Amino acid sequence: MKTTTILILLTHWVHSQIPINDNNTATLCLGHHAVANGTLVKTLTDDQIEVTNATELVQSTSTGKICNNSYRVLDGKNCTLIDAMLGDPHCDVFQYENWDLFVERSSAFSNCYPYDVPNYALLRSIVASSGTLEFMAEGFTWTGVTQNGGSSSCRRGSADSFFSRLNWLTKSGSSYSTLNVTMPNNDNFDKLYVWGIHHPSTNNEQTKLYVQASGRVTVSTKRSQQTILPNIGLRPWVRGQSGRVSIYWTIVKPGDVLMINSNGNLIAPRGYFKIRAGKSSIMRSDAPIDTCVSECITPNGSIPNDKPFQNVNKITYGKCPKYVKQSTLKLATGMRNIPGKRLRGIFGAIAGFIENGWEGMIDGWYGFRHQNSEGTGQAGDLKSTQAAIDQINGKLNRVIEKTNEKFHQIEKEFSEVEGRIQDLEKYVEDTKIDLWSYNAELLVTLENQHTIDLTDAEMNKLFERTRRQLRENAEDIGNGCFKIYHKCDNACIESIRNGTYDHDIYRDEALNNRFQIKGVELKSGYKDWILWISFAISCFLICVVLLGFIMWACQKGNIRCNICI
Protein backbone atom coordinates (compact mmCIF):
# COMPACT_ATOMS: atom_id res chain seq x y z
CA MET A 1 0.00 0.00 0.00
CA LYS A 2 2.84 2.35 0.88
CA THR A 3 4.56 1.53 -2.40
CA THR A 4 1.42 2.23 -4.40
CA THR A 5 0.95 5.58 -2.69
CA ILE A 6 4.55 6.65 -3.38
CA LEU A 7 4.29 5.68 -7.07
CA ILE A 8 1.05 7.65 -7.50
CA LEU A 9 2.58 10.73 -5.90
CA LEU A 10 5.73 10.50 -8.09
CA THR A 11 3.68 10.03 -11.25
CA HIS A 12 1.52 13.05 -10.40
CA TRP A 13 4.64 15.17 -9.65
CA VAL A 14 6.37 14.24 -12.92
CA HIS A 15 3.25 14.99 -14.96
CA SER A 16 3.00 18.35 -13.23
CA GLN A 17 6.33 19.35 -14.83
CA ILE A 18 4.92 19.07 -18.40
CA PRO A 19 3.43 22.40 -19.68
CA ILE A 20 -0.32 22.33 -19.96
CA ASN A 21 -1.91 23.77 -23.12
CA ASP A 22 -4.01 26.49 -21.51
CA ASN A 23 -6.57 28.36 -23.64
CA ASN A 24 -6.47 31.15 -21.08
CA THR A 25 -3.06 32.37 -22.33
CA ALA A 26 -1.65 33.59 -25.65
CA THR A 27 1.71 34.25 -27.25
CA LEU A 28 2.51 37.42 -29.21
CA CYS A 29 5.77 37.81 -31.14
CA LEU A 30 7.20 40.88 -32.84
CA GLY A 31 9.29 40.54 -35.96
CA HIS A 32 10.62 42.16 -39.09
CA HIS A 33 10.77 41.41 -42.77
CA ALA A 34 13.44 39.05 -44.11
CA VAL A 35 14.29 37.56 -47.48
CA ALA A 36 15.88 34.25 -48.44
CA ASN A 37 18.74 35.92 -50.31
CA GLY A 38 19.72 39.39 -49.13
CA THR A 39 22.26 41.85 -50.51
CA LEU A 40 25.66 42.55 -49.00
CA VAL A 41 26.53 46.18 -48.34
CA LYS A 42 29.36 48.00 -46.64
CA THR A 43 29.00 50.05 -43.45
CA LEU A 44 31.41 51.88 -41.18
CA THR A 45 31.66 48.90 -38.86
CA ASP A 46 31.34 45.98 -41.26
CA ASP A 47 32.68 45.38 -44.76
CA GLN A 48 29.86 42.95 -45.50
CA ILE A 49 26.49 43.09 -43.83
CA GLU A 50 23.37 41.54 -45.33
CA VAL A 51 20.28 43.70 -45.86
CA THR A 52 16.87 42.90 -47.30
CA ASN A 53 17.24 45.35 -50.17
CA ALA A 54 19.88 47.63 -51.69
CA THR A 55 20.21 49.92 -54.68
CA GLU A 56 23.23 50.02 -56.97
CA LEU A 57 24.66 53.56 -57.11
CA VAL A 58 27.28 53.11 -59.85
CA GLN A 59 26.28 53.10 -63.51
CA SER A 60 28.83 50.77 -65.09
CA THR A 61 27.40 50.26 -68.59
CA SER A 62 26.32 52.49 -71.45
CA THR A 63 23.65 52.06 -74.09
CA GLY A 64 26.36 51.78 -76.73
CA LYS A 65 24.80 54.61 -78.73
CA ILE A 66 24.61 58.39 -78.45
CA CYS A 67 21.10 59.72 -77.99
CA ASN A 68 20.27 62.76 -80.13
CA ASN A 69 17.33 63.88 -78.02
CA SER A 70 17.79 66.28 -75.11
CA TYR A 71 20.77 67.79 -76.98
CA ARG A 72 21.62 68.77 -80.54
CA VAL A 73 24.27 66.23 -81.48
CA LEU A 74 26.19 66.92 -84.68
CA ASP A 75 27.97 63.95 -86.25
CA GLY A 76 31.29 65.13 -87.69
CA LYS A 77 31.52 61.98 -89.84
CA ASN A 78 34.74 62.28 -91.89
CA CYS A 79 35.52 65.83 -90.73
CA THR A 80 37.23 67.19 -87.67
CA LEU A 81 35.84 70.37 -86.18
CA ILE A 82 38.87 72.40 -87.30
CA ASP A 83 38.58 71.09 -90.87
CA ALA A 84 34.90 72.06 -90.89
CA MET A 85 35.74 75.50 -89.53
CA LEU A 86 38.52 76.17 -92.05
CA GLY A 87 36.36 75.05 -94.95
CA ASP A 88 37.99 71.84 -96.14
CA PRO A 89 36.19 71.01 -99.43
CA HIS A 90 34.83 67.69 -98.15
CA CYS A 91 33.46 69.45 -95.05
CA ASP A 92 31.45 72.19 -96.78
CA VAL A 93 28.21 70.59 -95.54
CA PHE A 94 29.04 71.80 -92.02
CA GLN A 95 29.12 75.51 -92.86
CA TYR A 96 26.77 77.50 -90.60
CA GLU A 97 25.93 74.40 -88.54
CA ASN A 98 24.99 74.58 -84.83
CA TRP A 99 25.36 71.98 -82.08
CA ASP A 100 25.33 71.23 -78.40
CA LEU A 101 27.79 68.40 -78.89
CA PHE A 102 30.05 67.93 -81.90
CA VAL A 103 31.06 64.28 -82.26
CA GLU A 104 34.42 63.69 -83.92
CA ARG A 105 35.07 60.26 -85.40
CA SER A 106 38.34 58.35 -85.48
CA SER A 107 37.80 58.02 -89.25
CA ALA A 108 37.94 61.82 -89.76
CA PHE A 109 40.64 63.08 -92.14
CA SER A 110 41.84 66.27 -93.80
CA ASN A 111 41.53 66.55 -97.56
CA CYS A 112 43.14 69.90 -98.28
CA TYR A 113 46.55 71.55 -98.08
CA PRO A 114 48.48 70.04 -95.12
CA TYR A 115 48.43 72.32 -92.09
CA ASP A 116 49.17 72.50 -88.41
CA VAL A 117 47.72 74.56 -85.60
CA PRO A 118 50.34 75.50 -82.97
CA ASN A 119 47.63 75.76 -80.31
CA TYR A 120 45.18 73.28 -81.76
CA ALA A 121 43.44 72.30 -78.50
CA LEU A 122 42.60 75.86 -77.49
CA LEU A 123 41.19 76.80 -80.91
CA ARG A 124 39.18 73.56 -80.98
CA SER A 125 37.83 74.29 -77.52
CA ILE A 126 36.87 77.88 -78.37
CA VAL A 127 34.95 76.84 -81.47
CA ALA A 128 33.38 73.81 -79.79
CA SER A 129 32.07 75.78 -76.81
CA SER A 130 30.68 78.43 -79.16
CA GLY A 131 28.40 75.78 -80.66
CA THR A 132 28.27 77.25 -84.15
CA LEU A 133 30.23 77.70 -87.39
CA GLU A 134 28.34 80.88 -88.20
CA PHE A 135 30.65 82.91 -90.45
CA MET A 136 30.40 86.51 -91.59
CA ALA A 137 32.43 87.56 -94.66
CA GLU A 138 34.07 91.00 -94.51
CA GLY A 139 35.34 93.25 -97.27
CA PHE A 140 39.09 93.10 -96.77
CA THR A 141 40.98 95.03 -99.43
CA TRP A 142 44.12 93.30 -100.63
CA THR A 143 45.94 95.41 -103.23
CA GLY A 144 49.07 94.51 -105.14
CA VAL A 145 48.62 90.79 -104.67
CA THR A 146 46.77 87.90 -106.28
CA GLN A 147 43.92 86.43 -104.23
CA ASN A 148 42.23 83.03 -104.09
CA GLY A 149 45.29 80.84 -104.44
CA GLY A 150 44.67 77.13 -104.79
CA SER A 151 46.45 73.78 -104.71
CA SER A 152 46.07 70.43 -106.40
CA SER A 153 46.08 68.88 -102.91
CA CYS A 154 42.81 70.65 -102.12
CA ARG A 155 40.40 70.10 -104.95
CA ARG A 156 36.84 71.32 -104.92
CA GLY A 157 35.14 69.41 -107.65
CA SER A 158 37.59 69.19 -110.55
CA ALA A 159 39.38 72.49 -109.82
CA ASP A 160 42.32 73.31 -107.59
CA SER A 161 41.07 75.06 -104.49
CA PHE A 162 41.83 75.97 -100.88
CA PHE A 163 40.14 76.34 -97.50
CA SER A 164 36.97 78.31 -98.15
CA ARG A 165 37.35 80.49 -95.03
CA LEU A 166 40.92 81.52 -95.91
CA ASN A 167 42.38 83.58 -98.74
CA TRP A 168 45.79 82.51 -100.07
CA LEU A 169 47.58 85.64 -101.29
CA THR A 170 50.45 85.37 -103.77
CA LYS A 171 52.43 87.80 -105.91
CA SER A 172 50.77 89.92 -108.55
CA GLY A 173 52.92 89.89 -111.66
CA SER A 174 56.47 90.18 -110.44
CA SER A 175 55.81 91.93 -107.14
CA TYR A 176 54.17 91.38 -103.78
CA SER A 177 53.09 94.66 -102.25
CA THR A 178 53.38 95.27 -98.55
CA LEU A 179 49.94 94.86 -97.02
CA ASN A 180 48.52 97.06 -94.26
CA VAL A 181 44.86 96.36 -93.56
CA THR A 182 42.69 97.33 -90.60
CA MET A 183 39.25 96.05 -89.62
CA PRO A 184 37.46 97.57 -86.59
CA ASN A 185 34.97 95.67 -84.46
CA ASN A 186 31.99 97.98 -84.20
CA ASP A 187 29.67 95.25 -82.92
CA ASN A 188 28.93 94.25 -79.33
CA PHE A 189 30.33 90.72 -79.48
CA ASP A 190 33.72 89.05 -79.82
CA LYS A 191 34.94 88.14 -83.29
CA LEU A 192 37.24 85.25 -84.08
CA TYR A 193 39.55 85.82 -87.07
CA VAL A 194 41.43 82.79 -88.40
CA TRP A 195 44.54 83.40 -90.51
CA GLY A 196 47.81 81.68 -91.31
CA ILE A 197 51.25 81.69 -92.82
CA HIS A 198 52.60 79.54 -95.63
CA HIS A 199 55.88 77.64 -95.19
CA PRO A 200 57.26 76.81 -98.67
CA SER A 201 59.35 73.69 -99.08
CA THR A 202 62.20 75.44 -100.95
CA ASN A 203 63.64 78.93 -101.45
CA ASN A 204 62.71 78.68 -105.10
CA GLU A 205 59.06 78.10 -104.18
CA GLN A 206 59.27 81.05 -101.78
CA THR A 207 60.43 83.54 -104.40
CA LYS A 208 58.18 82.03 -107.05
CA LEU A 209 55.11 82.71 -104.91
CA TYR A 210 56.07 85.81 -102.92
CA VAL A 211 59.12 87.36 -104.66
CA GLN A 212 60.81 88.18 -101.33
CA ALA A 213 63.31 85.67 -100.00
CA SER A 214 61.47 85.69 -96.69
CA GLY A 215 58.08 87.09 -95.90
CA ARG A 216 56.60 88.22 -92.59
CA VAL A 217 53.12 88.33 -91.10
CA THR A 218 52.14 90.55 -88.16
CA VAL A 219 48.62 90.57 -86.74
CA SER A 220 47.80 93.01 -83.95
CA THR A 221 45.01 94.37 -81.78
CA LYS A 222 45.11 96.81 -78.90
CA ARG A 223 45.64 93.85 -76.57
CA SER A 224 47.98 91.56 -78.51
CA GLN A 225 50.46 91.20 -81.34
CA GLN A 226 51.78 88.17 -83.20
CA THR A 227 54.65 88.24 -85.69
CA ILE A 228 55.29 85.03 -87.61
CA LEU A 229 58.10 84.27 -90.05
CA PRO A 230 57.95 81.44 -92.60
CA ASN A 231 60.04 78.35 -91.92
CA ILE A 232 61.26 77.30 -95.36
CA GLY A 233 62.33 73.67 -95.76
CA LEU A 234 61.41 70.19 -96.92
CA ARG A 235 58.89 68.20 -94.89
CA PRO A 236 57.33 64.77 -95.36
CA TRP A 237 55.10 64.66 -98.39
CA VAL A 238 51.39 64.82 -97.65
CA ARG A 239 48.87 64.76 -100.49
CA GLY A 240 51.64 65.71 -102.91
CA GLN A 241 52.87 68.68 -100.85
CA SER A 242 56.08 69.21 -98.90
CA GLY A 243 55.10 72.71 -97.77
CA ARG A 244 52.85 73.52 -94.80
CA VAL A 245 50.40 76.13 -93.60
CA SER A 246 50.37 77.15 -89.94
CA ILE A 247 46.98 78.32 -88.67
CA TYR A 248 46.66 81.10 -86.09
CA TRP A 249 43.75 83.10 -84.80
CA THR A 250 42.97 86.40 -83.14
CA ILE A 251 39.95 87.40 -81.04
CA VAL A 252 38.90 91.01 -81.49
CA LYS A 253 36.84 92.52 -78.67
CA PRO A 254 34.08 95.10 -79.26
CA GLY A 255 35.67 98.50 -79.90
CA ASP A 256 39.03 96.98 -80.79
CA VAL A 257 40.73 96.93 -84.21
CA LEU A 258 42.32 94.10 -86.17
CA MET A 259 45.53 95.15 -87.96
CA ILE A 260 47.29 92.94 -90.50
CA ASN A 261 50.75 93.74 -91.88
CA SER A 262 52.61 91.45 -94.30
CA ASN A 263 55.13 91.45 -97.10
CA GLY A 264 54.62 87.80 -98.05
CA ASN A 265 53.40 84.33 -97.10
CA LEU A 266 50.07 85.58 -95.66
CA ILE A 267 47.05 83.28 -95.56
CA ALA A 268 44.44 85.99 -95.02
CA PRO A 269 41.04 85.79 -93.29
CA ARG A 270 37.88 86.25 -95.35
CA GLY A 271 35.78 87.25 -92.37
CA TYR A 272 35.09 86.25 -88.78
CA PHE A 273 33.33 83.63 -86.69
CA LYS A 274 30.89 84.90 -84.11
CA ILE A 275 31.96 83.79 -80.63
CA ARG A 276 29.14 82.70 -78.36
CA ALA A 277 29.35 81.92 -74.69
CA GLY A 278 27.71 78.57 -74.09
CA LYS A 279 27.91 75.05 -72.77
CA SER A 280 28.45 73.39 -76.15
CA SER A 281 31.29 70.92 -76.39
CA ILE A 282 33.08 68.34 -78.49
CA MET A 283 33.72 64.65 -77.97
CA ARG A 284 35.66 61.95 -79.77
CA SER A 285 33.52 58.85 -80.12
CA ASP A 286 32.74 56.08 -82.58
CA ALA A 287 29.42 55.21 -80.95
CA PRO A 288 26.49 55.43 -83.39
CA ILE A 289 24.00 58.28 -83.02
CA ASP A 290 20.42 57.13 -82.57
CA THR A 291 16.99 58.56 -81.78
CA CYS A 292 16.63 58.16 -78.03
CA VAL A 293 16.55 60.29 -74.90
CA SER A 294 19.39 60.69 -72.43
CA GLU A 295 20.78 63.62 -70.47
CA CYS A 296 24.28 62.18 -70.17
CA ILE A 297 26.61 61.31 -73.04
CA THR A 298 30.01 59.62 -72.85
CA PRO A 299 32.34 58.45 -75.65
CA ASN A 300 31.07 54.93 -74.95
CA GLY A 301 27.49 56.03 -75.52
CA SER A 302 24.70 57.62 -73.54
CA ILE A 303 24.06 56.50 -69.97
CA PRO A 304 21.14 57.00 -67.59
CA ASN A 305 21.63 59.67 -64.94
CA ASP A 306 19.40 58.09 -62.31
CA LYS A 307 22.46 57.02 -60.32
CA PRO A 308 24.84 59.38 -58.53
CA PHE A 309 28.04 57.72 -59.80
CA GLN A 310 29.31 56.18 -63.01
CA ASN A 311 32.31 54.10 -63.99
CA VAL A 312 31.85 54.25 -67.77
CA ASN A 313 34.13 57.12 -68.82
CA LYS A 314 35.81 60.18 -67.36
CA ILE A 315 34.70 62.27 -70.34
CA THR A 316 31.04 63.25 -70.20
CA TYR A 317 28.60 65.80 -71.58
CA GLY A 318 25.36 66.90 -69.99
CA LYS A 319 23.85 66.20 -66.61
CA CYS A 320 25.90 63.19 -65.63
CA PRO A 321 26.74 61.06 -62.61
CA LYS A 322 30.12 61.67 -61.02
CA TYR A 323 32.93 59.43 -62.27
CA VAL A 324 34.44 57.13 -59.63
CA LYS A 325 36.89 54.25 -59.73
CA GLN A 326 34.58 51.76 -58.03
CA SER A 327 32.50 49.54 -60.28
CA THR A 328 29.87 49.03 -57.58
CA LEU A 329 28.58 50.91 -54.53
CA LYS A 330 25.36 49.64 -52.97
CA LEU A 331 23.08 51.83 -50.88
CA ALA A 332 21.02 49.94 -48.30
CA THR A 333 17.31 50.62 -48.81
CA GLY A 334 16.11 47.88 -46.48
CA MET A 335 16.80 46.59 -43.01
CA ARG A 336 19.29 44.11 -41.64
CA ASN A 337 18.45 40.70 -43.09
CA ILE A 338 18.23 37.68 -40.77
CA PRO A 339 16.73 34.81 -42.79
CA GLY A 340 14.28 32.64 -40.86
CA LYS A 341 15.34 29.25 -39.52
CA ARG A 342 13.23 26.23 -40.28
CA LEU A 343 12.92 24.61 -36.84
CA ARG A 344 11.54 26.67 -33.98
CA GLY A 345 10.24 24.22 -31.38
CA ILE A 346 6.71 24.31 -29.97
CA PHE A 347 5.71 27.60 -31.65
CA GLY A 348 7.33 26.83 -35.00
CA ALA A 349 7.98 29.98 -37.09
CA ILE A 350 6.37 32.23 -34.49
CA ALA A 351 9.72 33.07 -32.86
CA GLY A 352 10.42 36.80 -32.49
CA PHE A 353 12.88 39.24 -34.04
CA ILE A 354 15.77 38.42 -31.70
CA GLU A 355 16.03 34.93 -33.19
CA ASN A 356 15.31 35.59 -36.86
CA GLY A 357 13.45 37.64 -39.44
CA TRP A 358 10.21 36.61 -41.08
CA GLU A 359 10.16 35.69 -44.74
CA GLY A 360 6.98 36.31 -46.68
CA MET A 361 5.81 39.48 -44.94
CA ILE A 362 3.99 41.45 -47.63
CA ASP A 363 2.10 44.04 -45.59
CA GLY A 364 4.97 45.76 -43.82
CA TRP A 365 8.58 45.73 -42.70
CA TYR A 366 7.59 45.14 -39.08
CA GLY A 367 4.71 43.13 -37.70
CA PHE A 368 3.15 40.71 -35.22
CA ARG A 369 2.56 36.99 -35.10
CA HIS A 370 0.32 35.46 -32.47
CA GLN A 371 -0.90 32.15 -31.17
CA ASN A 372 -4.08 31.99 -29.09
CA SER A 373 -7.18 29.88 -28.58
CA GLU A 374 -8.37 30.83 -32.08
CA GLY A 375 -5.19 29.69 -33.80
CA THR A 376 -2.26 31.64 -35.26
CA GLY A 377 -2.03 34.80 -37.37
CA GLN A 378 0.22 37.52 -38.71
CA ALA A 379 -0.18 41.21 -39.53
CA GLY A 380 2.14 44.08 -40.42
CA ASP A 381 2.54 47.25 -38.39
CA LEU A 382 1.94 50.24 -40.65
CA LYS A 383 3.15 52.93 -38.26
CA SER A 384 6.67 51.61 -37.67
CA THR A 385 6.99 50.49 -41.29
CA GLN A 386 6.04 53.93 -42.60
CA ALA A 387 8.40 55.65 -40.16
CA ALA A 388 11.33 53.62 -41.49
CA ILE A 389 10.33 54.03 -45.14
CA ASP A 390 9.93 57.80 -44.76
CA GLN A 391 13.49 58.09 -43.51
CA ILE A 392 14.95 55.82 -46.19
CA ASN A 393 12.95 57.28 -49.08
CA GLY A 394 14.75 60.21 -50.60
CA LYS A 395 18.20 58.91 -49.66
CA LEU A 396 18.97 58.07 -53.28
CA ASN A 397 17.66 61.41 -54.54
CA ARG A 398 19.70 63.28 -51.95
CA VAL A 399 22.86 61.44 -52.95
CA ILE A 400 22.18 62.19 -56.64
CA GLU A 401 21.65 65.88 -55.88
CA LYS A 402 24.96 66.00 -54.05
CA THR A 403 26.96 64.38 -56.81
CA ASN A 404 25.42 64.93 -60.26
CA GLU A 405 27.36 67.23 -62.54
CA LYS A 406 25.38 70.17 -63.86
CA PHE A 407 28.10 70.75 -66.46
CA HIS A 408 30.22 68.70 -68.79
CA GLN A 409 33.73 67.36 -68.36
CA ILE A 410 35.48 68.27 -71.60
CA GLU A 411 38.36 66.48 -73.22
CA LYS A 412 41.73 68.04 -72.59
CA GLU A 413 44.44 68.02 -75.23
CA PHE A 414 47.92 69.45 -75.20
CA SER A 415 50.61 69.78 -77.79
CA GLU A 416 53.94 68.06 -77.33
CA VAL A 417 55.46 71.36 -76.24
CA GLU A 418 52.96 71.48 -73.38
CA GLY A 419 53.90 68.06 -72.06
CA ARG A 420 54.57 69.26 -68.53
CA ILE A 421 51.20 71.02 -68.42
CA GLN A 422 49.58 67.82 -69.65
CA ASP A 423 51.29 65.78 -66.95
CA LEU A 424 50.19 68.28 -64.30
CA GLU A 425 46.62 68.31 -65.62
CA LYS A 426 46.53 64.50 -65.61
CA TYR A 427 47.82 64.45 -62.04
CA VAL A 428 45.18 66.95 -60.94
CA GLU A 429 42.38 65.01 -62.68
CA ASP A 430 43.56 61.69 -61.22
CA THR A 431 43.72 63.25 -57.77
CA LYS A 432 40.19 64.60 -58.14
CA ILE A 433 38.95 61.16 -59.16
CA ASP A 434 40.72 59.55 -56.19
CA LEU A 435 39.13 62.06 -53.82
CA TRP A 436 35.67 61.62 -55.31
CA SER A 437 36.01 57.84 -55.21
CA TYR A 438 36.95 57.99 -51.53
CA ASN A 439 34.19 60.48 -50.75
CA ALA A 440 31.64 58.35 -52.60
CA GLU A 441 32.52 55.24 -50.62
CA LEU A 442 32.51 57.16 -47.35
CA LEU A 443 29.15 58.73 -48.15
CA VAL A 444 27.60 55.35 -48.97
CA THR A 445 28.98 53.61 -45.88
CA LEU A 446 27.68 56.43 -43.67
CA GLU A 447 24.23 56.23 -45.24
CA ASN A 448 24.20 52.43 -44.93
CA GLN A 449 25.15 52.61 -41.26
CA HIS A 450 22.39 55.15 -40.67
CA THR A 451 19.82 53.00 -42.49
CA ILE A 452 20.60 49.88 -40.49
CA ASP A 453 20.66 51.79 -37.20
CA LEU A 454 17.32 53.48 -37.84
CA THR A 455 15.59 50.26 -38.95
CA ASP A 456 16.89 48.50 -35.83
CA ALA A 457 15.67 51.46 -33.77
CA GLU A 458 12.17 51.23 -35.26
CA MET A 459 12.03 47.54 -34.29
CA ASN A 460 13.02 48.41 -30.74
CA LYS A 461 10.46 51.23 -30.61
CA LEU A 462 7.71 48.82 -31.63
CA PHE A 463 8.82 46.33 -28.98
CA GLU A 464 8.87 48.98 -26.26
CA ARG A 465 5.50 50.31 -27.34
CA THR A 466 4.02 46.83 -27.04
CA ARG A 467 5.69 46.16 -23.68
CA ARG A 468 4.33 49.41 -22.23
CA GLN A 469 0.82 48.43 -23.30
CA LEU A 470 0.89 44.93 -21.83
CA ARG A 471 2.67 45.83 -18.56
CA GLU A 472 2.25 43.07 -15.94
CA ASN A 473 -0.37 41.27 -18.05
CA ALA A 474 2.40 39.60 -20.05
CA GLU A 475 5.96 38.43 -19.67
CA ASP A 476 8.86 39.07 -22.02
CA ILE A 477 10.10 35.56 -22.71
CA GLY A 478 13.35 36.82 -24.21
CA ASN A 479 13.18 36.10 -27.94
CA GLY A 480 11.10 39.04 -29.09
CA CYS A 481 7.91 37.42 -27.82
CA PHE A 482 5.46 38.00 -24.98
CA LYS A 483 3.50 35.39 -23.08
CA ILE A 484 0.10 36.92 -22.30
CA TYR A 485 -1.42 35.63 -19.06
CA HIS A 486 -5.05 36.10 -19.95
CA LYS A 487 -7.37 34.91 -22.65
CA CYS A 488 -6.60 37.11 -25.69
CA ASP A 489 -8.71 36.44 -28.75
CA ASN A 490 -8.08 37.95 -32.18
CA ALA A 491 -9.88 41.18 -31.25
CA CYS A 492 -7.63 41.52 -28.21
CA ILE A 493 -4.54 40.90 -30.35
CA GLU A 494 -5.73 43.55 -32.81
CA SER A 495 -6.12 46.08 -29.98
CA ILE A 496 -2.49 45.49 -29.02
CA ARG A 497 -1.40 46.03 -32.60
CA ASN A 498 -3.34 49.26 -33.08
CA GLY A 499 -2.49 50.69 -29.66
CA THR A 500 -6.00 50.57 -28.10
CA TYR A 501 -5.30 47.72 -25.66
CA ASP A 502 -6.52 48.45 -22.09
CA HIS A 503 -4.45 46.41 -19.65
CA ASP A 504 -6.74 47.24 -16.72
CA ILE A 505 -9.55 45.15 -18.21
CA TYR A 506 -7.43 42.00 -18.14
CA ARG A 507 -5.31 42.74 -15.08
CA ASP A 508 -7.08 40.54 -12.51
CA GLU A 509 -7.34 37.60 -14.88
CA ALA A 510 -3.69 37.91 -15.85
CA LEU A 511 -2.50 38.05 -12.23
CA ASN A 512 -4.60 35.02 -11.27
CA ASN A 513 -3.37 32.97 -14.24
CA ARG A 514 0.22 34.05 -13.69
CA PHE A 515 0.22 32.76 -10.07
CA GLN A 516 -1.49 29.50 -11.01
CA ILE A 517 0.91 28.81 -13.85
CA LYS A 518 3.98 29.89 -11.90
CA GLY A 519 3.08 27.45 -9.13
CA VAL A 520 3.82 24.47 -11.33
CA GLU A 521 5.94 25.99 -14.08
CA LEU A 522 9.56 25.00 -14.20
CA LYS A 523 12.15 26.94 -16.01
CA SER A 524 13.50 25.43 -19.19
CA GLY A 525 16.91 23.96 -18.50
CA TYR A 526 16.03 22.38 -15.11
CA LYS A 527 13.22 20.11 -16.28
CA ASP A 528 15.48 17.39 -17.65
CA TRP A 529 17.60 17.28 -14.51
CA ILE A 530 14.59 17.04 -12.22
CA LEU A 531 12.96 14.34 -14.35
CA TRP A 532 16.13 12.22 -14.29
CA ILE A 533 16.53 12.68 -10.54
CA SER A 534 12.88 11.78 -9.90
CA PHE A 535 13.23 8.71 -12.12
CA ALA A 536 16.31 7.56 -10.21
CA ILE A 537 14.60 8.04 -6.85
CA SER A 538 11.54 6.16 -8.06
CA CYS A 539 13.67 3.22 -9.22
CA PHE A 540 15.53 3.16 -5.90
CA LEU A 541 12.30 3.14 -3.91
CA ILE A 542 10.88 0.33 -6.04
CA CYS A 543 14.04 -1.74 -5.44
CA VAL A 544 13.84 -1.11 -1.67
CA VAL A 545 10.18 -2.12 -1.56
CA LEU A 546 10.88 -5.27 -3.61
CA LEU A 547 13.82 -6.26 -1.38
CA GLY A 548 11.72 -5.72 1.75
CA PHE A 549 8.94 -7.89 0.36
CA ILE A 550 11.38 -10.71 -0.38
CA MET A 551 12.89 -10.55 3.12
CA TRP A 552 9.44 -10.53 4.71
CA ALA A 553 8.35 -13.52 2.67
CA CYS A 554 11.47 -15.47 3.60
CA GLN A 555 10.92 -14.72 7.28
CA LYS A 556 7.32 -16.02 7.17
CA GLY A 557 8.36 -19.14 5.33
CA ASN A 558 6.50 -18.27 2.19
CA ILE A 559 9.74 -18.25 0.23
CA ARG A 560 12.59 -20.73 0.60
CA CYS A 561 16.03 -20.17 -0.78
CA ASN A 562 18.33 -23.18 -1.27
CA ILE A 563 22.03 -22.62 -1.97
CA CYS A 564 23.87 -25.66 -3.42
CA ILE A 565 27.64 -26.01 -3.69
Curated annotation (Swiss-Prot):
A lipid is attached at C554, C561, C564 (S-palmitoyl cysteine). Pfam families: Hemagglutinin (PF00509). Its main location: virion. The record marks R344, G345 as: Cleavage. SUPFAM superfamilies: Influenza hemagglutinin (stalk), Viral protein domain. It is found in: Virion membrane; Host apical cell membrane. InterPro entries: Capsid_hemagglutn, Hemagglutn_HA1_a/b_dom_sf, Hemagglutn_influenz_A, Hemagglutn_influenz_A/B. Palmitoylated. In natural infection, inactive HA is matured into HA1 and HA2 outside the cell by one or more trypsin-like, arginine-specific endoprotease secreted by the bronchial epithelial cells. One identified protease that may be involved in this process is secreted in lungs by club cells. Glycans are attached at N23, N37, N53, N68, N78, N180, N300, N498. Residues 1-16 form the signal peptide. It is a single-pass type I membrane protein. Belongs to the influenza viruses hemagglutinin family. This is Hemagglutinin.
